[in-house]
Amino acid sequence: MNDTFMKTKPVFPLLVSMALPNVISMLVNSLYNIVDSLFVARINEQAMTALSLVFPVQNLINAISIGFGIGINAQIALYLGAGDREKADISATHGMALSMLHGLLCTVIGIAIMPGFLRRFTTDESLVSMGVLYTTIVFLFSIVNMADLAFEKMFQAVGRMKTTMAALIAGCVCNIVLDPVLIFGLGPVPALGIAGAALATNFGQFVTFCIYLSCYSTADLPVRLRRKHLRPNAALDSKLYAIGIPAILNLALPSLLVTFLNGLLAAFSQSYVTVLGIYYKLQTFLYLPANGIVQGMRPLVGYNYGAKEHGRVAKLYRLTLGLSAAIMAVGTVLCLTISGSLIGLFSSNPETIAIGAKALRIICLGFIVSAVSTTSSGALEGLGKGVPSLVISLCRYVLFIMPLAWLLCRAFGPTGVWHAFWITEVCSAAIAFVVYRKAVAKK
């Protein structure tokens, strides 16, 4: 298969062709996240709170799979752009093997730490029990999840975006269909409650894996997994981790942030913890499609950077920034106009709806400007510049928001936490612009 279209096709149709399947699959994935939470919320508000409490650890494991996958994606694209097919094959082979090893480690460690982790935030043993049950089932499929992401990034690196779209949509649809059946029961299928939600997630991931495996076996790809490359290669593995570790940290930092914010908000009421969890479910409907555009850009900037096409890299960055900002503008309008209705999808508690509506109207003020940070971070990852990308994420998730949330919470209560979000996005965008310009200047 010829992959030179990445440096010859006009930039706008090229980005659209690469990003649109990602945006569609991310929208479907966002819909799954919303629908899954809606079904869990119908069990009771306690179940929704349990999901909010386990979110940081679950997000951390997802961060490991996606972040290391970004390293795989960047290395394959860079080597293909430079015309080195063998190193691209080695990157793919080692990336898949290491991803599955990560999955095994996450299963063992994740199951072991969850009871103690949950008891740090609640004394309600029924909440702990629900959280442990859900995560134990989900974590047992960590190897499948890791393999899914390795395949996804490999297909994206060679421009096979429609394959990733089909695999992700099939898994999400399976999940959405099975959620009500396994949670509430149907015919001979018993009602499994929150365990049913976890099982539906696992079945969806397995369907995605089967589709990737089938497509890989039948497709003519410019990169292949080869048994002969399964031997130690410290130099190449170090490059995978040099990009993957900062990317993992980028994605894991929200887990650290949510854990920190849960600690602040739990001192006031569990309703605030629930609202934070609902917000993170809702914001995926914006950030995942925007991330779909960034995912489409990432292999393109990597390929063109490897091919010394720096002008095309700059055009791709500007176009991605504009499209991402447009998506975030839509989200801002929705949160300002129908915030109460959005929160009401997940809770019938009047107190939770009132708190959540106010939170959304404040937090959304930083949505549009956040496009600068997300685009800059994604472009830097595609260029193989993991450390500058990590600096941007540290600003967004640690250096600005944590001190601001703590100070403003002490001064204004929980409302101060919501204001910390948009202030952080404004400050981080300024830093991101400077960091990106300096990083790409070093060619």
Give residue ranges: language-model regions.
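Small-residue-rich hydrophobic transmembrane alpha-helices
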Residues: M48-V108, N145-G159, T163-T164, N262, ...
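Short alpha-helical transmembrane segments in multi-pass integral membrane proteins
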Residues: M1-A19, I76-I143, V189-I245, V301-G366, ...
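Helix-terminus/linker motif at the lipid-water interface of multi-pass membrane proteins
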Residues: L27, L31-T49, L118-E125, V181-L192, ...
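Short runs within selected transmembrane alpha-helices of multi-pass transporters and secretion channels
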Residues: G69, N73, V138-Q156, T164-C172, ...
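Transmembrane helical elements of multi-pass membrane transporters/channels
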Residues: S17-D36, I137, G171, G204-T208, ...
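Hydrophobic transmembrane alpha-helices of multi-pass small-molecule transporters
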Residues: L60-A63, T107, N175-P180, F209-L213, ...
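Residue-level signal for short hydrophobic patches within transmembrane helices
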Residues: T8, F12-L31, V35, V57-I64, ...
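Interfacial/gating helices of multi-pass transporter permease domains
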Residues: F39-N59, E125-M130, I194-G196, L236-I243, ...
